[in-house]
Amino acid sequence: MKVTLIAILTCATVLVLHTTAAEELEAESQLMEVGMPDTELAAVDEERLFECSVSCEIEKEGNKDCKKKKCKGGWKCKFNMCVKV
């Protein structure tokens, strides 16, 4: 009797864990579909990082103090990189 009860509880636990994992995968797949614009935003973020650091490097090569380029739209230039404020 105990073995049967343990087997039933084990199966129930596995079923719950499997269902939870399936729900997480479904949620992740929906986020990936909705998150496609985020990859475009990440590309913009990378461009901002690159743009700011390149402008500072060019100014340093000219033996001038590096004037930090002003990043717009909630971004600021810090350590030669645009960071979100």
UniProtKB/Swiss-Prot annotation:
GO molecular function annotations of the record: toxin activity
Localization in the cell: Secreted
Pfam families associated with the record: Toxin_20
Highest rank taxon of the organism: Eukaryota
Tissues/organs with expression: Expressed by the venom gland.
Functional summary from the UniProt entry: Neurotoxin active on both insects and mammals.
Protein name: U4-theraphotoxin-Hhn1a
Native source species: Cyriopagopus hainanus (Chinese bird spider)
Organism phylogeny: Eukaryota, Metazoa, Ecdysozoa, Arthropoda, Chelicerata
